[in-house]
Amino acid sequence: MNLEKQLHDGLKAIPELSADTGHLCSRLLRYIELIAKWNSTHNLTSVRNPESMITRHMLDSLVILPHVSGPGIVDVGSGAGFPGIPVALARPEWQVTLVESNQKKAAFLLQAVLELGLPNISVKQGRVEKIKLENKVDTVVSRAFSSLERFMSLSKHLSENDSDHCRFIAMKGEFPDMELMQLSSEFVVEKIVAVTVPGLKAKRHLVVIRYQPG
């Protein structure tokens, strides 16, 4: 199976995407090319195989769409742009902010935004606890960033404009029993959703949290 067919079939398996995924497919493939080009010198991701990138990065990022509310999205610890760039490609009407502390990875994100032509993405290089945003944030998402408690402690200020409305989504593999037990009471878990990534057997869970200041 070639890359285009693999990706196209995977996109078709995600109901939240439009029936015509051809344009999205071509842009995601271009994104994979950029990652491969930069990966040799910048070590953006340990996943080197393009086929694995489709499943473990692109489709893994896009299955969160039904649980994400826009238009204001923040991707904390974005790394090579997951899930923020695939989400921004699929939802061009949303405004996505990528937060990344690593200078080399942030440089890649800026280049990817430029080459992919993504005016709905902004890149913030720095530690998330130091980042200040003027616009309203609807969803803050993290993937392989840290524990639930640390993610929330460092990111909670991003919801200061409307903490009742903003939701935090942590993308996890196995059900995070221990991390849930360690969460402070101000971080209210609203739901935990098991999600299926097309072509991936590994377990995936989304933890949806609301910040409730004392």
Curated annotation (Swiss-Prot):
It catalyses: guanosine(527) in 16S rRNA + S-adenosyl-L-methionine = N(7)-methylguanosine(527) in 16S rRNA + S-adenosyl-L-homocysteine. It comes from the Bacteria. S-adenosyl-L-methionine binds at residues 77, 82, 128-129, 143. GO terms for molecular function: rRNA (guanine-N7-)-methyltransferase activity. One of its GO terms (cellular component) is cytosol. InterPro entries: rRNA_ssu_MeTfrase_G, SAM-dependent_MTases_sf. Keywords: Cytoplasm, Methyltransferase, rRNA processing, S-adenosyl-L-methionine, Transferase. It is found in: Cytoplasm. Its EC number is 2.1.1.170. It is an enzyme of class 2 (transferase). NCBIfam families: rsmG_gidB (TIGR00138). Belongs to the methyltransferase superfamily. RNA methyltransferase RsmG family. Specifically methylates the N7 position of guanine in position 527 of 16S rRNA. This is Ribosomal RNA small subunit methyltransferase G. It comes from Nitrosomonas europaea (strain ATCC 19718 / CIP 103999 / KCTC 2705 / NBRC 14298).
